[in-house]
UniProtKB/Swiss-Prot annotation:
PANTHER family: 5-AZACYTIDINE-INDUCED PROTEIN 2, PROSAPIP2 PROTEIN/5-AZACYTIDINE INDUCED GENE 2
Record's subcellular location: Cytoplasm
Location of the region described as Disordered in the Swiss-Prot/TrEMBL record: 321-340, 345-393
Keywords: Coiled coil, Cytoplasm, Phosphoprotein, Ubl conjugation
Organism name: Bos taurus
Post-translational modification comment from the UniProt entry: Ubiquitinated via 'Lys-48'-linked polyubiquitination by TRIM38, leading to its degradation.
Quaternary organization: Homodimer. Interacts with IKBKE, TBK1 and TICAM1. Interacts with TAX1BP1. Interacts with CALCOCO2.
Coiled-coil spans in chain: 40-198
Protein name: 5-azacytidine-induced protein 2
Described purpose of this protein according to its UniProt entry: Adapter protein which binds TBK1 and IKBKE playing a role in antiviral innate immunity. Activates serine/threonine-protein kinase TBK1 and facilitates its oligomerization. Enhances the phosphorylation of NF-kappa-B p65 subunit RELA by TBK1. Promotes TBK1-induced as well as TNF-alpha or PMA-induced activation of NF-kappa-B. Participates in IFNB promoter activation via TICAM1.
Length: 393
């Protein structure tokens, strides 16, 4: 292509050179043939000139296209050189994307499994919560019913607290009794050792033993009388309360039989007289009598709760000031009340034992110079009494 372009340029240059040469005039009179040949040459020259211009334009266009193609070829070569590195990067990116997709699928499956487990556990917990709520409602209803029952039947005194205090006293006395037994066993062991080592110290040990036993017996006897007094007082208080409750629970038909004022007076006259002393208590019930000496109003109506409470308080206040007795510290026998040896209150009957005697048991064997001992309560007797009290409670 360059050679052709150069030829064209040479032709043009040659044409220019010919133009510069002086034109020799042609004679007009040479003939028709010379004119025709000259015209043919001119037309041929113009045609060749036109073709040369077209070829120059085409050559310039082709040169531009060649340059564009060369640039594209150079770019393609550069792309081919960098394509190996790009492919490796693309492969790495693809593998990474694939791994990320696999991890995403695994995490999605784990999430679905966890959601399923959570839904099942939530369902189980909801069932347990519903069951607990049902149990709580049942307990609330039971507590409310118990509160309603307690409000309808309020206690007239604090006999439950007194009973609990008596139980605590009994437990303390049992512990003291165990300590005294242990002390007695230790004293017996010491006495035997002293007898084996030195017979002359027998009298002194006997005297000391008797003194200790006398002190311990006095303590046990005083504790016994104190416990008996508390138990008798508690027994009579419960008996009075039971009597008042029986009067309160009489049917409504019997309530209409007597006038309210008369029945209240009869209830005041028929109230329990509670006699409390230091160690014993007596319970006496006096039925109201008519002027002819006959009892009136056999069917006692049930008073109101407030009236019953007032009457019980009056009976309790009157009972604390009557029939006091002295404390038998010397260990002599005392006269038991008839209410202790018989059953009362159907299921709540209490039986108190008779006081211990000196002839029942002794604390130790005396071989030489026996001294007179005071009346001591036997240990097994007190244990049996405590067990009976616990069983009856």
């Amino acid at each position: 292509m360059d050679a052709l372009v150069e030829d064209d340029i040479c032709i043009l240059n040659h044409e220019k050179a010919h133009r510069r040469d002086p034109v020799t005039p042609v004679s007009i009179y040479s003939g028709d043939e010379s004119v025709a040949s000259h015209f043919a040459l001119v037309t041929a020259y113009e045609d060749i000139k036109k073709r040369l211009k077209d070829s120059e334009k085409e050559n310039s266009f082709l040169k531009k296209r060649i340059r564009i193609l060369e640039e594209k070829l150079i770019g393609a070569r550069k792309d081919e050189e960098t394509s190996s590195v790009g492919r490796e990067q693309v492969n790495k990116a693809y593998h990474a994307y694939r791994e990320v997709c696999i991890d995403r699928d695994n995490l999605k499956s784990k999430l679905d499994k966890m959601n399923k487990d959570n839904s099942e556990s939530l369902k189980v917990l909801n069932e347990q919560l519903q069951s607990k709520e049902v149990e709580l409602l049942q307990l609330r209803t039971e507590v409310e019913t118990q509160q309603v029952i307690r409000n309808l039947n309020p206690p007239s005194s604090n006999w439950e607290v007194e009973k609990l205090s008596c139980d605590l006293k009994i437990h303390g006395l049992e512990q003291e009794l165990e300590l005294l037994r242990k002390e007695c066993r230790d004293l017996r062991i010491e006495l035997q050792k002293a007898k084996q080592t030195d017979p002359s110290l027998d009298d002194n040990l006997n005297c000391r033993d008797l003194q200790r036993l006398s002190v311990s017996s006095d303590n046990m006897q005083s504790a016994y009388w104190e416990l008996k007094r508390e138990m008798s007082n508690l027994h009579l208080v419960t008996q009075v309360q039971a009597e008042l409750l029986r009067k309160l629970k009489t049917p409504a038909a019997i309530k209409k039989a007597c006038a309210p004022a008369g029945c209240m007076e009869d209830l005041g006259k028929d109230s329990t007289k509670l006699h409390l002393s230091n160690f014993t208590a007596a319970y006496k019930r006096h039925a109201p009598l008519s002027p002819n000496g006959k009892t009136l109003c056999h069917a006692t109506p049930s008073p109101l709760p407030g009236d019953a409470k007032v009457l019980s308080e009056k009976a309790a206040l009157q009972s604390w000031t009557d029939h006091e007795r002295s404390i038998p510290h010397d260990g002599t026998n005392f006269q038991e009340h008839n209410s202790y040896s018989r059953n009362s209150l159907e299921d709540n009957s209490w039986v108190f034992p008779s006081p211990p005697k000196s002839s029942e048991t002794t604390f130790g064997e005396m071989k030489s110079k026996p001294l007179p001992l005071p009346n001591l309560p036997p240990l097994h007797y007190l244990d049996q009494h405590n067990q009976n009290c616990h069983y009856k409670h």
